């Protein structure tokens, strides 16, 4: 203390700065916390899902796994790393159209997926059964997973094998619901032809509602009577009847 009394103010400030601890404890702790708590995507695909040790075995997965577990689980509705260049409706498929019945292979619709399952996970999971034409998760315009995916095999037998193996098997804690896409979708796309029994209502394509029978009154026709409407019109008399009435009237006037 006595030494500082003999020192100038600038020397005391320099001495105090040199005696301060280097680095910020709060910032360092935050960096250590962030490094230890957050895991990479490799642990999620390799060990977390397959039930093995994280980081061992690379991206291969032995079987559909139960859970990634821990704090490495991504938050729901996480945006994927890569979005498709051109968005299209999830139920739209360019294969439906002229010659859709000639489409070969087998197509599976996988639903009840965890929101963290990506396209790479689906491809990796089903590629062991055969060659894939397409395997993709459905996303909305915001990049959030819809929990469904399309898996298209080149051979229908491979699709049936995969459906038999994985249908109902939990993936990340949620059992997968796998269905084989058939021609029922085409039947749903066909226009419904209404059959009228005794003049029922028919709906022509691009037209308005009408009735099959021409004797039936249109909608709202003659339903409500306006002012003075609905009364029987006055009967018109012929010339002979008018002359007879005039003669009778003149006869009554003469007698009176």
UniProtKB/Swiss-Prot annotation:
It comes from the Eukaryota. It is found in: Nucleus; Nucleus speckle; Cytoplasm. Residues 1-86, 186-256 are annotated as: Disordered. Pfam families: FoP_duplication (PF13865), RRM_1 (PF00076). GO terms for molecular function: C5-methylcytidine-containing RNA reader activity; mRNA binding. Residues 216-228 have a biased composition (Basic residues). GO terms for biological process: mRNA export from nucleus; mRNA processing; RNA export from nucleus; RNA splicing. Residues 1-14 have a biased composition (Basic and acidic residues). SUPFAM superfamilies: RNA-binding domain, RBD. Residues 106-183 form the RRM domain. One of its GO terms (cellular component) is nucleus. Residues 24-58 have a biased composition (Gly residues). Keywords: Chaperone, Cytoplasm, mRNA processing, mRNA splicing, mRNA transport, Nucleus, RNA-binding, Transport. Residues 186-196 have a biased composition (Polar residues). Signal peptide: none annotated. PANTHER family: RNA AND EXPORT FACTOR BINDING PROTEIN, THO COMPLEX SUBUNIT 4. Belongs to the ALYREF family. Functions as an mRNA export adapter; component of the transcription/export (TREX) complex which is thought to couple mRNA transcription, processing and nuclear export, and specifically associates with spliced mRNA and not with unspliced pre-mRNA. TREX is recruited to spliced mRNAs by a transcription-independent mechanism, binds to mRNA upstream of the exon-junction complex (EJC) and is recruited in a splicing- and cap-dependent manner to a region near the 5' end of the mRNA where it functions in mRNA export to the cytoplasm via the TAP/NXF1 pathway. Component of the transcription/export (TREX) complex; TREX seems to have a dynamic structure involving ATP-dependent remodeling. This is THO complex subunit 4-A. It comes from Xenopus laevis. The gene is alyref-a.
